[in-house]
Amino acid sequence: MLALNAGSQYPGRGRGRGRGDGGNRVHKHDGINRYHGGFRGGRGGGGGGFRDGDMRECRERESWAVSAAQANARTLARVPVPVETNCFPIDLSEGRFHNYIVSFEFLENATDMAGDMWKISLQNELLRTIRKNRTAEKRTRTSAEVEDLCVCTGQAILAPAKLSVEDGFSIECTRKEKVSRNNTEERHYRVRIRYDGEVSLKLPEHAQWVNKIIAFGLADTYSEHIGSDYVDMKSTVERGGDLVTMDAISLNALRIVKQSGSTTAMMDVLQLDVSTKASTKTKCSDEMRRLRQQNPQGFRRAVNEALVGISVTTVFGEPTFLKVKAIDFNILASSPTMFKTNPEETFVEYFKRKYDAIIDPTLPMLYCIFADRTKMSRRMPYPADSLLLNKLNEAQLSKLPILCSIYPNERMKRIKAALERVLASPLMITVLQQYGVRIQPQFVKVSGRVLPAPTIYVPSGPNMFNRINTAEYTGQAGFALGLKDLQHPSQPCEFKTLLMDEYFMHGNITHWLQKYNVALPSPRKTSFDSAAQRITEGPGTFAMVKLRTKEAGAYNNFKERFARSSIVSQMAVVDLTRNVPQMITQQVAAKIGQLCFVADVDEAGKSFACRPLLIVGAVVGTAMNTMLEKYKSINVRLYTITFVAFLANGKSWKPYCMHHQVKGEEHVLYEDSDAASSHMSSTTLTVRRQNANEVLNNRFPDFLKEVTAHFKLNGKGSKGTMVLYRGAMTDAEVGFTANMDLVMEQVLPNWDTATVVVHPRSHFRMAWDPTTVFPHETASAYAGLSNVPRGFSTTDCRIILADSDPYTPVDSFYLSAANCTLGHAANTYYLVQKRAASISLMDLQKLTYNMCYMYPNKPDALPLPLPIKCAYEYARKYGSLKSVKELPTRMRPTMHYL
């Protein structure tokens, strides 16, 4: 737990700032800028931000590397390409700890509280008692006393040496919990310790313990643990416009497999990444005043909807991340603190005396806990003037690409500097020595190959295609110019009605629909005044609407209304100038199943040639939605399970899709005093009713049967190939893929199948020095590390999961599919859980890479292949459409989500 300032009731704060919790700006879709999730600063690092000259130099280095790779494509395809990674060797040969099992006996008023933090708090009290019984020395921050270096996990205590305590030693602990303003209950527990022997550290079995041990040593460098990141709150830098940034790192101990030709070797490594967190200097009090001025009558509800559940940062004393759990409108800053030392002193007087701060006495108190889940804390009252919002507004979000982007050359420098700083800290030195862990500060290098860029085919008439050599297109526009002669072959029109508002009718769209031979009927002019108006048309209708605002709410309302009527729609807010009409028309064609550019499946290799190929993408998306009732506001986490399928035969690609919504956790943000029993609004957690990954597995057989019936693939003599791409944002999701191949074998018994887990957010980083392949470029002004070439793939650094047999052959690869000149490219990890002997790993890599060029909204290579990119886009878009819990049947053979 973060120590309190002497004489202070609050975690302290200096001049630090908070962690960004706004939204990530994502790509435009249908002309809408949409935001989701919390900002992680994932591309940033080490202080963030660039001077103009630095950024220009980095961009020029990346552009030069792209040009060098293009000019020497044949050479790159023939030779191994060495790259540096953000992994460092870790030696656990002497690593060990003494394991102590801790049990908890519930005494008077005791309850089993949520999480493990209360257990960790009791374990720390037990250790303090053991230390006190053994020595009278006062604990120091870098003390080498064994009790001071123990790692508490909730279930056990990891000690670097044996504790001076007998088996069965126990203490009775008391915890006070405030159940109301004037009522506190004492809860009594008995904590007992039992020795379970010495354990030698091994990866991957003890990865979580190794990570906890190393994290313990970060307390004097990156002390704040938020999610998977460790933040240095003292690294705060003001960036102007009420923005601040700070440094953060993430680390993970892994066992990997390195391959060199036919030989393989296992290696233990520490994976370390850097990032920059962004936050704001806006106080909670400023937001409260704005909301009160905006709507005095609805002030309480608006404040709860805006602030309850968000992360904030303390203004005074030591910088600390907190989470707002409740707002009490009956307790103002002018109320007495009820602190033991001076219970009649008001919060206004306390902060004036302690920090010489001016506090607004009219605003309600916010009750907060530590945002760091590794710290045990009870709710503490904070005046709104003492807390900073971590949520960024739209103007601040627009600055993040400059503040938080970091390029490979700079990233690798900062990673090395961060590791050197951590290893030099007195606490980390002591921790590593005591537990027998050694970390070597040399980057692990791997080798890979560059896959050839695919040929893309553009329809130009009946059974006619224009060829595009994608290797020739490396600019931001991709191969868009290659679509100028696009003309789809004639096909039956599945849509009976095309509705256009006046904007589209006069925007030259009809001309391009005819020129591209898009299978839609002649348009009918319609006025769409609002999403609430009655729409008489139903299935078999396509609607095109110009939105008046960029607000996501208007977009969602129209999408929801159309989807309930089985209407596929296209919306835009941009002006129909320059090449915008062509781009919109190409997207419309793709939505109804006429892809404007495709790869030839036969060219991916003989594993997929001359037979039907069924490709399925399956993911779980998540979104927070606020549900407004008459007397209540509830935050609901919705999980959207999406399935996207394509039947490919040569150059023919036919789509199909489906989704299901699963309701997750609910948090009550506001409840009217007439309906609620308390004046304190707070979050209430309901038990998650279903695990979304389990629902995906349960729904997968029905979807696969539906797809095979739609494409008529389930005949007795039916043979072909199926590849399942299962998206996984975390390692925990990987396990849910284990039995999906059995479903594929049951539904398509005569088909060859492969199952691939796609991990798009691994912290695995790669950086390439072009001079290692092109020595003649050594004298270049742009020499240094850059992004790996587009198409770079490596089977090195396969991660061994804790529950897997390291000696069982498993295929996997990293693939960097897209050029990146605006930061550090993501390296998607592909774990091949199962594949038929007839499907070669090389062909599977080619197929995956070729599909990275096929996303209809972007005629260029993207980091993710078509099925996974579509599935995530589908989940992101429909996660906000609460009433469309399942897609109507008539919309399923489309790509409506584009």
Curated annotation (Swiss-Prot):
Species this chain originates from: Leishmania braziliensis
Name of the protein: Protein argonaute 1
Pfam families the record matches: ArgoL2 (PF16488), PAZ (PF02170)
Keyword Protein transport: no
SUPFAM superfamilies with a match to the protein in the record: PAZ domain (SSF101690), Ribonuclease H-like (SSF53098)
Positions of the UniProt region annotated as Disordered: 1-52
Sequence similarity: Belongs to the argonaute family.
Single GO term (MF): RNA binding
Gene: AGO1
